[in-house]
C-alpha cells in the first residue's frame, strides 16, 4: 500500500535541470564577486535575489561555460505505478465529490465526503464558532498598505534587507482547511479493530474532530511573522517547563522516582484558537522585558508588540468563496504561532501557577510539582505524588485564565507479558512505565491509528534516503526504549520494512549502524558543501555536473579562485519530487464545480484603467517573428502574469527591429520599456532604437511597439536557461512547437 509520502516516478525535465546548473554557476560568480567584500549585515530575514552577475575572471568564465555545457545523464527508469494505478490517481485528482486530507497524526490519507467535510469539520466545528467571523470584502490590500505604514513607523528597527523582504512580496490571501484527528475518534478506532484491513471505511463519524490550519505561505503578514519567529524563538528554551522534543524528555526524565508517584498528562483544549490577543501580548511584553539581552537591541519592545498585534489581528482567509477573519487566538500555520503559544503558557506558569498552588500546597510541595512538570507547547506531563490532592491541582490549572482549559489523564495500571505490573502513560511518542518500586522504563508509543506504513522502497526517492530509513527508525527505537523492549520493537520494525519492500541487507546494515550509534563519520563532510540544488529525478542524473564542478574547482590556477573555493566541495542537494500528498490535497476548497481550463494565448485584462492592455497588447494565440517563423502560445498570459519570456517588435520598422527578453512581473517590465522608449534615458538598444524612430517620424503617440509572448514558467530561475536562446530564438529546447 502506498502512503502519502510515496513519490510516483516522473519524466525528466531537461529545462529544469539546466536551470539548476545555471543557478549553481551564478552562485560561483557571486562567491567570486563578493569574496573580499566585508559586510556587517545583521538581517534576520532577507529575500533571495535573481539578478544575473557577470565575472571578469577568465578562468571562472571557462569553468562556468564547461559546467553549463555539461548535460545531465539521461536514463530510462521504469515507472513505479502501473497503468491502472495512474488512472486511479488521475480519477482521485479530478474527483469533485470527495476531499482528501492527511490525518493530523500519522502517515495516513483520509478520503471524506465533500459535504461532510464542509458542513461538519469546517463550518459546524470551527467557522461557525465565536473564534471566526465572516467579512464582506477581502481586505488584504488594505492590510498590506497598513503593513507598509507599520514598517515606515519603525524603520530604525529594521535593516534595509529586512524591510525590503517584508514589504516586497506578491501576497495572496490564505486558505482555511482542517486536518482530521482520526486518532481521537472512538468510531474510527473501533472500525480499525473490527475491519483489520489496510484501509477502513465508515460513514460520517460524528465524533471526528479536526485541527484548523490557515495556510498562508504568501499572505500579507507572512514575512513579518517570519521575522517575529526569529526574534522570539530564542526565548522559548528559557521556560522552566520547556522540552524541545522526545529526546529532550528522555534526558530530563529521572530513572527512578518515589514509589508514591503517579503519571499524569494534560492537554490544553484548542490552545492556538483560545489565546486572547490581550493575554498573548501581555505575555510577550513580560518575556521580552525579562530577557532583553537575548534580543537584538535595534528591535524595540514597542516594535515587537505592535508587529505581533498586527499579525494577530489581520488573519484573513478564504473558504469556499467566502472571506473570514479569525478574531481570537492565532492561526495555526503562521510562523510565529509556536513560540507565541509557548511563551503565553510559560507566562501563566511563571506568574499565576505558583501563587495559586500555594493556596493548597506547601512551598516544598509546590517546588516538587513545578520541577517535575514538562510541557511541549500544549501537551504537559508530570510525576504526581499520590499523597497530594490531584483535584486541587486540576482546579488550579483550569483557573490560570478563563480562556485556557485543560484535560487530564492519569496513567493506567496494566500487566506486561512477563507478569510485571506497571502504570503506563504516553507523552509525545514515548510510552512511560512506572513500576511499583519507583523504577521508570520507556517504550516507543504508537497510536491506535498508526499503520506502520513506511515509505515504500520503490518510491521515487534517492537511494541514500531510502537506505537510511531503517537506520533512522531503528535508532529511534534504541534510544526511546528501555533495553528489554528493544529487540521486540526491532523485530516488529523489520516485519513492517520487509512488507514495504526494503531488502533484508539494507535493513540489517541500518540496524547494525543504529546499535553502534551511527555509521562511521565521512571525512568528506568536514569540507564546506557547495550545493547544486535540484529536484530528484532518476531519469536525469545531475551527478556528472557535480563531479565536473568538483574537478574544475579543485584544479583552479588563479590565486583568488583558490582562496574563494578553498575547502569547498560541490555536492548534489536533492529536493523531493511531488508525492501523493501534494498531488491529492489542496488547501483551497470550493463547493462549486471546477472551472474549465483557461484558453491559451495572450489576453487583455478586464481593467479599463490598464493602459498597457488598452494601447499595447494585441490578443492572439500565435504570432510570427521577423524571420517568418510562427509560434503558438501554450499558456494563458495577461499583463498580471509572472516569469514570462516576451517578444517586442518596433512598429516604425515593420518588425525589422525586435527584442526578445525575460521578466518576472510582466506588467512592470512592459511599463519600464514604455517609459524608456519615451524618454530615451536608457542603455537598452531596442528602447533607444524606438525612441530614435519616434523622433524621426515625429510620432510620440502610443503604441510604440507590439508585444507578444513566448511562454510563462513557474519560477524566475526557470527563465535562466533561456538566456542563451533569447536572441537566436531557438526555442526547440523549451518545448515550444513551431507551427
Protein language model regions, located:
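Charged structural interfaces that engage phosphate-rich ligands
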Residues: 1-739
Amino acid at each position: 500500500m502506498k502512503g502519502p509520502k510515496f513519490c510516483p516516478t516522473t519524466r525528466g525535465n531537461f529545462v529544469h535541470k539546466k536551470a539548476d546548473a545555471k543557478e549553481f554557476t551564478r552562485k560561483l560568480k557571486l562567491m567570486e564577486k563578493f569574496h573580499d567584500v566585508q559586510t556587517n549585515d545583521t538581517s534576520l530575514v532577507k529575500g533571495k535575489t535573481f539578478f544575473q552577475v557577470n565575472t571578469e575572471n577568465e578562468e571562472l568564465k571557462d569553468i562556468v561555460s564547461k559546467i553549463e555545457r555539461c548535460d545531465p545523464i539521461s536514463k530510462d527508469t521504469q515507472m513505479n505505478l502501473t497503468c491502472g494505478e495512474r488512472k486511479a490517481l488521475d480519477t482521485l485528482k479530478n474527483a469533485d465529490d470527495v476531499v482528501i486530507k492527511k490525518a493530523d497524526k500519522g502517515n495516513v490519507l483520509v478520503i471524506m465526503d465533500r459535504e461532510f467535510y464542509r458542513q461538519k469539520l469546517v463550518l459546524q466545528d470551527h467557522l461557525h464558532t465565536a473564534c471566526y467571523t465572516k467579512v464582506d470584502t477581502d481586505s488584504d490590500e488594505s492590510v498590506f498598505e497598513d503593513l507598509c505604514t507599520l514598517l515606515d513607523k519603525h524603520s530604525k528597527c529594521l535593516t534595509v534587507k529586512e524591510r525590503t523582504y517584508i514589504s516586497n512580496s506578491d501576497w495572496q490571501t490564505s486558505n482555511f482547511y482542517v486536518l482530521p484527528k482520526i486518532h481521537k475518534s472512538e468510531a474510527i478506532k473501533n472500525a480499525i479493530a473490527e475491519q483489520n484491513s489496510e484501509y477502513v471505511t465508515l460513514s460520517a463519524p460524528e465524533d471526528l474532530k479536526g485541527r484548523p490550519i490557515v495556510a498562508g505561505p504568501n499572505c500579507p503578514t507572512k514575512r513579518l511573522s517570519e521575522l517575529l519567529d526569529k526574534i522570539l524563538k530564542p526565548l522559548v528554551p528559557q521556560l522552566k517547563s520547556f522540552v524541545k522534543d522526545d529526546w529532550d524528555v528522555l534526558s530530563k526524565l529521572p530513572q527512578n522516582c518515589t514509589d508514591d508517584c503517579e503519571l499524569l498528562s494534560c492537554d490544553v483544549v484548542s490552545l492556538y484558537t483560545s489565546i486572547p490577543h490581550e493575554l498573548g501580548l501581555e505575555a510577550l511584553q513580560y518575556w521580552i522585558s525579562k530577557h532583553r539581552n537575548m534580543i537584538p537591541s535595534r528591535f524595540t519592545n514597542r516594535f515587537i508588540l505592535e508587529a505581533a498585534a498586527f499579525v494577530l489581528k489581520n488573519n484573513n482567509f478564504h473558504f469556499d468563496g467566502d472571506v473570514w477573519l479569525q478574531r481570537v487566538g492565532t492561526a495555526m500555520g503562521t510562523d510565529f504561532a509556536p513560540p507565541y503559544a509557548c511563551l503565553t503558557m510559560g507566562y501563566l506558569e511563571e506568574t499565576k501557577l505558583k501563587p495559586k498552588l500555594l493556596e493548597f500546597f506547601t512551598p516544598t510541595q509546590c517546588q516538587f510539582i513545578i520541577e517535575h512538570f514538562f510541557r511541549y507547547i500544549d501537551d504537559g506531563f508530570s510525576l504526581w505524588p499520590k499523597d497530594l490532592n490531584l483535584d486541587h491541582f486540576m482546579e488550579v490549572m483550569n483557573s490560570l485564565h478563563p480562556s485556557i482549559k485543560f484535560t487530564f489523564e492519569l496513567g493506567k495500571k496494566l500487566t506486561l507479558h512477563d507478569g510485571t505490573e506497571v502504570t503506563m502513560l504516553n507523552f509525545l511518542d514515548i510510552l512511560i512505565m512506572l513500576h511499583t518500586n519507583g523504577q521508570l522504563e520507556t517504550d516507543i508509543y504508537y497510536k491506535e491509528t498508526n499503520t506502520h506504513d513506511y515509505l515504500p522502497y520503490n518510491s521515487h526517492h534517492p537511494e541514500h534516503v531510502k537506505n537510511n530509513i531503517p537506520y533512522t527508525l531503528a535508532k529511534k527505537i534504541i534510544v526511546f526504549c528501555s533495553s528489554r523492549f528493544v529487540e521486540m520493537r526491532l523485530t516488529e520494525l523489520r516485519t513492517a520494512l520487509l512488507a514495504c519492500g526494503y531488502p533484508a541487507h539494507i535493513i540489517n546494515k541500518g540496524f547494525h549502524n543504529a546499535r553502534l550509534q551511527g555509521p562511521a563519520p565521512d571525512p568528506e563532510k568536514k569540507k564546506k558543501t557547495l550545493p547544486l540544488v535540484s529536484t530528484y529525478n532518476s531519469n536525469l542524473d545531475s551527478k556528472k555536473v557535480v563531479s565536473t564542478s568538483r574537478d574544475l574547482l579543485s584544479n583552479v590556477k588563479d590565486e583568488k579562485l583558490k582562496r574563494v573555493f578553498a575547502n569547498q566541495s560541490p555536492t548534489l542537494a536533492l529536493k523531493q519530487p511531488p508525492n501523493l500528498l501534494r498531488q491529492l490535497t489542496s488547501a483551497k476548497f470550493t463547493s462549486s464545480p471546477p472551472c474549465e481550463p483557461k484558453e491559451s494565448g495572450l489576453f487583455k485584462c478586464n481593467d479599463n484603467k490598464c493602459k498597457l492592455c488598452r494601447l499595447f497588447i494585441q490578443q492572439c494565440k500565435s504570432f510570427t517573428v521577423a524571420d517568418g517563423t510562427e509560434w503558438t502560445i501554450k499558456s494563458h498570459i495577461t499583463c498580471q502574469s509572472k516569469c514570462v519570456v516576451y517578444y517586442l517588435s518596433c512598429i516604425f520598422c515593420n518588425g525589422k527591429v525586435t527584442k526578445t527578453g525575460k521578466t518576472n512581473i510582466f506588467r512592470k517590465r512592459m511599463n519600464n520599456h514604455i517609459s524608456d522608449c519615451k524618454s530615451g534615458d536608457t542603455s537598452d538598444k531596442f528602447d533607444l532604437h524606438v525612441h530614435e524612430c519616434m523622433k524621426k517620424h515625429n510620432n510620440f503617440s502610443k503604441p510604440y511597439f507590439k508585444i507578444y509572448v513566448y511562454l510563462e514558467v513557474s519560477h524566475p530561475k526557470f527563465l535562466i536557461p533561456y538566456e542563451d536562446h533569447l536572441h537566436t530564438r531557438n526555442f526547440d529546447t523549451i518545448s515550444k512547437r513551431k507551427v
